[in-house]
């Protein structure tokens, strides 16, 4: 790259400016892009700046998106939230301040992203007020710069990161216009998308900086960031540098960027998931073409995105549940002079208007013969338009043509479609025509139908371009604010009818158009309008000339779109139920298709049930009129309802797990939580109709909820014990108590926490088995059993004693029914048999618990194992001769090894500390004592003759030894041990 001064002096000013944009200096910031192939297993680089902030929760597959979220987006949200809390403290309306404070704090606990708070329009005033603070702006700017710097340095192709950021290679400007493009490709050469960049030359307008200084904007650029990507699979990131007020790129050390993050979606295609840009982003006007700008380092920079494109991108981010939120501001009051764009900024994607006129006069081969419009648009009109009303030249030409007649508009469109072979250019023409029709109050519906038919039947278009063209028309219908929803519904029905009944489209293209129409229908303003639209589309499918099989396929596509939408479960259930009903009544859906759609309905119903039960439990816990007993009984009833519901076992388990988490994470005190979980265990164990297998599965789910809840370990242990206690309130099954341990194993709890929870479960199970065994014997009058080998024989003594009591009683009451001694003995024997059976059952329970599979050990056994392990670790430590080896041993075995219990690690550390202290004491007492078992040179060693008998011999040897302890190294080891102990104790205190 070269500087401007190095270009030949003959280059005129305009060419020099374009060359400067195309050929940045080495110091100049550049646009970049990154692409990671689908399901890439490339590991995230280890960098110190990101290692402490990027979590390992696995929620984000793409490392760049994850890094941006956790080092830029979320920290910026947190800083804004902190400033809002400061502002609330000074708010006069204390009720409102307290309400908003609670809203922020509660959402922080539930969802640390704060997306709901920032996405709530009611909070916008608070957010804008916070963004006015200069100190906050500095913090946000610092976060943006530091975060992007680390991301770019880490994920850069030049540093060996596969698919990392590399410069965008813009092609030369197209003809004499200020339009240039680039085809973005991955490392394999596959095309990802085509980016078009337009340099906009404006009559100067000014914007105000924060200090009131006016800055003149002479030039900026627009880039048509893609909304959908459907070519190559994977994740892509487009990072475009912001331009200075004069339209040139800044140096790298002052650069800021507008970055679009496209993350691999469920189908493998990149989806627009996040947008990262400086905060706050402002727009110079309220029109869709208003340019974005920011103040950075006291300077004004323009970003390569317009207000319309930004809003469209943010809607896509919201659709894919990204964490970015729209914090942009429309700053019309900052504009001191806003002129329309000059003539050269309106770059037709096809040709200039003069060329367009000649093309219209040329006969075409399309079905509609061309008719020259009565008048062509004037260039001067374009230059006089206010900026807020700027449109692209195609739209202006289309609107002018439509002012004559719809036939004139078709002539204009068809002439362009025939002349231009590029699909994107053809789509832009169709899109402009649709916009012109919808902006005209006359005959919208009829003209949209004509345009759609013309698009579907136009031989100048490829099948894929036809799909894209019709979808562009549908997107225009969706975004048009001046068309009532009822009229939009009729347009959707007509579009679907044209597509499905066309002989020029394959089934695949027909389905793509249908799916887009359904998407538009699902985005109408209210549920009534959406229902009318989907019902109309369904009826259109049924009435079409497709085969019954193809009709069924299309209805399934409608159902899939409804099922995948972001609507509430209740509305999805209504819409899907209507499609299914119509498909069954008209015999369009096959039995298999009916079953598939019914499965979707069942899943929605199950989700509704799950959410309803969770909401019900939340209401019970929050009800101030309920004491602990009432809450326990109410949640037991909810548990029973879940167990009795017809939903699948998987959903039942998820529901029970969610309910348990709600209880465990509630603000109730620990004992109240224990009582409620105990009640849930009792409700499951005592259920009358559930099979043992179903009960076991339910118990596992409850314990998984306990183990995964965000609460203190001690509370989890108490709730686990409570669950086992609840099981034992009914007749306990050993497999049911083992289910508690399996629930722990299935959870995502930490390994050391899992063992603690399983130990708690085993402890209470053993205690309850002992209690039940004693209780069972006491109930049969065997409070103090004699030491006999056979309990049955022992109990016969009781039977003999009974005879001496029964006979006198019967003699004294002859009116009673006589009972033979034989009958009495039979009855007594039956009772004793019951006692024996009870005893055998309890013994078997003990055997099951004490079997090798149960992992149940006595306290003495555990202590012995721990002592043995401590001795082994101390002995192994003694084999490490160097300080470095000893430090590595401490880190690997005592700090990082979570498979060892906390007690074993702490005992080992204590024992090693004692040894180090003893060695140090000996060294201080006898500093000159040496050992000669290791050949290490010591400062205290000395040369001695080989033989005392021949002192003249000069040949000597070095008697080498080592000090008993090197004081400096001893201090290092003691420090490492104490750090390890602190780390273990601190990790125990984490929630």
Swiss-Prot record:
Q: What is its main location?
A: cytoplasm
Instruction: Quote the biased-composition stretches of kind Acidic residues, using this chain's numbering.
Output: 1-10
Entry's localization field: Cytoplasm
UniProt biased composition (Basic and acidic residues): 743-789
Task: Tell me one Pfam family matched here.
Answer: 120_Rick_ant
Q: Any one cellular component term from GO for this entry? A: cytoplasm
Q: Where is the composition biased (Polar residues)?
A: 36-63
What InterPro entries does the entry give?
Rickettsia_antigen_120kDa (IPR020954)
Q: Looking at the record, which segments are called Disordered?
A: 1-63, 738-789
What UniProt keywords apply to this chain's record, in alphabetical order? Answer: Cytoplasm
Protein name (database record): Antigenic heat-stable 120 kDa protein
Q: Which gene encodes it?
A: sca4
């Amino acid at each position: 790259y070269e500087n401007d001064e190095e270009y030949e002096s003959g280059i005129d000013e305009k060419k020099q400016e374009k060359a400067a944009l195309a050929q940045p200096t080495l110091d100049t910031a550049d646009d970049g892009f990154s692409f990671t192939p689908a399901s890439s297993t490339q590991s995230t680089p280890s960098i110190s700046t990101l290692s402490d902030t990027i979590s390992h929760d696995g929620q984000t597959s793409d490392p760049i998106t994850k890094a941006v979220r956790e080092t830029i987006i979320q920290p910026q949200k947190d800083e804004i939230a902190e400033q809002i809390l400061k502002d609330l403290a000074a708010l006069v309306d204390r009720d409102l301040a307290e309400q908003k404070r609670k809203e922020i704090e509660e959402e922080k606990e539930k969802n640390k992203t704060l997306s709901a708070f920032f996405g709530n329009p009611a909070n916008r005033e608070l957010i804008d007020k916070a963004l006015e603070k200069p100190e906050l702006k500095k913090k946000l700017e610092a976060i943006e710069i530091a975060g992007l710097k680390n991301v770019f340095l880490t994920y850069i192709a030049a540093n060996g990161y596969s698919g990392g950021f590399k410069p965008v290679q813009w092609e030369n400007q197209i003809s004499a216009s200020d339009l240039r493009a680039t085809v973005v490709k991955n490392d394999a050469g596959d095309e990802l998308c085509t980016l078009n960049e337009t340099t906009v030359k404006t009559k100067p307008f000014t914007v105000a900086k924060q200090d009131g200084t006016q800055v003149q904007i002479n030039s900026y650029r627009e880039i048509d960031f893609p909304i959908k990507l459907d070519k190559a699979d994977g994740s892509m990131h487009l990072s475009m540098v912001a331009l200075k007020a004069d339209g040139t790129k800044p140096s790298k050390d002052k650069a800021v960027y507008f970055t679009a993050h496209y993350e691999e979606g469920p189908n493998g295609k990149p989806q627009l998931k996040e947008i990262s840009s400086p905060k706050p982003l402002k727009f110079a006007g309220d029109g869709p073409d208003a340019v974005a700008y920011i103040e950075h380092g006291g300077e004004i920079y323009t970003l390569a995105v317009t207000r319309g494109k930004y809003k469209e991108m943010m809607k896509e981010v919201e659709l894919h549940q990204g964490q970015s939120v729209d914090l942009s501001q429309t700053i019309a009051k900052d504009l001191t002079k806003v002129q329309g764009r000059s003539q050269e900024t309106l770059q037709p994607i096809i040709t200039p208007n003069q060329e367009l006129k000649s093309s219209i006069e040329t006969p075409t081969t399309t079905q509609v013969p061309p008719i020259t419009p009565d008048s062509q648009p004037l260039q001067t009109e374009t230059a006089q338009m206010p900026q807020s009303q700027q449109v692209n030249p195609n739209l202006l030409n289309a609107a002018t043509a439509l002012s004559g007649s719809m036939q004139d508009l078709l002539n204009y469109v068809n002439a362009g479609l025939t002349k231009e072979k590029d699909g994107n250019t053809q789509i832009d023409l169709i899109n402009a025509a649709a916009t012109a029709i919808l902006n005209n109050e006359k005959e919208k519906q009829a003209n949209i139908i004509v345009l759609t038919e013309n698009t579907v039947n136009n031989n100048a278009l490829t099948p894929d371009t036809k799909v894209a063209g019709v979808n562009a028309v549908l997107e225009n219908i969706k975004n048009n604010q001046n068309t009532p929803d009822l009229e939009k519904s009729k347009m959707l029905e007509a579009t679907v009818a044209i597509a499905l009944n066309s002989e020029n489209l394959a089934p695949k293209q027909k389905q793509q158009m249908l799916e887009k129409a359904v998407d538009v229908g699902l985005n109408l303003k209210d549920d009534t309008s959406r229902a009318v639209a989907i019902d109309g589309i369904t009826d259109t499918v049924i009435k079409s000339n497709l085969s019954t099989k193809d009709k069924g396929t299309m209805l399934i596509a409608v159902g899939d779109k409804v099922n995948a939408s972001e609507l509430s479960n209740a509305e999805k259930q209504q819409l899907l139920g209507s499609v299914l009903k119509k498909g069954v009544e008209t015999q369009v859906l096959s039995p298999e298709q009916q079953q598939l759609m019914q499965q979707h309905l069942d899943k929605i119903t199950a989700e509704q049930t799950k959410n309803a039960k969770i909401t019900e439990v939340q209401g019970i816990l929050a009800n101030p009129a309920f004491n602990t007993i009432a809450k326990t009984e109410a949640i037991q009833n909810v548990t029973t309802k879940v167990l009795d519901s017809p939903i699948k076992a998987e959903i039942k388990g998820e529901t029970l797990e969610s309910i348990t988490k709600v209880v465990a994470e509630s603000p109730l005190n620990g004992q109240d939580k224990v009582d409620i979980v105990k009640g849930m265990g009792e409700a499951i164990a005592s259920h009358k109709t559930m099979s043992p297998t179903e009960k076991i599965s339910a118990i596992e789910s409850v314990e998984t909820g306990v183990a995964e809840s965000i609460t203190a370990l001690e509370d989890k242990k108490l709730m686990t014990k409570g669950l086992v206690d609840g099981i034992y309130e009914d007749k306990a099954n050993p497999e049911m108590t083992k289910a508690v341990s399996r629930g722990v194993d299935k959870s995502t709890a930490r390994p050391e926490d899992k063992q603690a929870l399983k130990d708690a479960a085993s402890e209470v199970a053993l205690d309850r088995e002992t209690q039940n065994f004693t209780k069972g014997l006491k109930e049969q009058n065997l409070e103090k059993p004699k030491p006999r080998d056979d309990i049955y024989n022992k109990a016969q003594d009781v039977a003999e004693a009974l005879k001496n009591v029964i006979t006198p009683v019967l003699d004294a009451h002859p009116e009673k029914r006589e009972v033979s001694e034989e009958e009495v003995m039979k009855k007594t024997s039956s009772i004793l048999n019951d006692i024996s059976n009870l005893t055998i059952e309890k013994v078997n329970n003990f055997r099951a618990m004490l079997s090798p599979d149960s992992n149940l050990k006595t306290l003495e056994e555990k202590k012995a194992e721990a002592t043995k392990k401590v001795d082994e670790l101390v002995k192994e430590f003694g084999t490490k001769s160097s300080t470095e080896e000893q430090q590595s041993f401490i880190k690997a075995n005592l700090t990082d090894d979570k498979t060892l219990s906390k007690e074993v690690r702490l005992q080992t550390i204590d024992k090693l500390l004692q040894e180090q202290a003893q060695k140090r004491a000996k060294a201080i007492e006898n500093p000159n004592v040496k050992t000669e078992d290791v050949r290490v040179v010591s400062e205290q060693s000395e040369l001695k003759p080989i033989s005392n008998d021949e002192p003249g011999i000069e040949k000597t040897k070095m008697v080498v030894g080592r000090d008993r302890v090197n004081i400096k190294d001893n201090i290092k080891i003691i420090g490492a041990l104490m750090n390890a102990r602190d780390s273990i104790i601190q990790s125990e205190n984490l929630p």
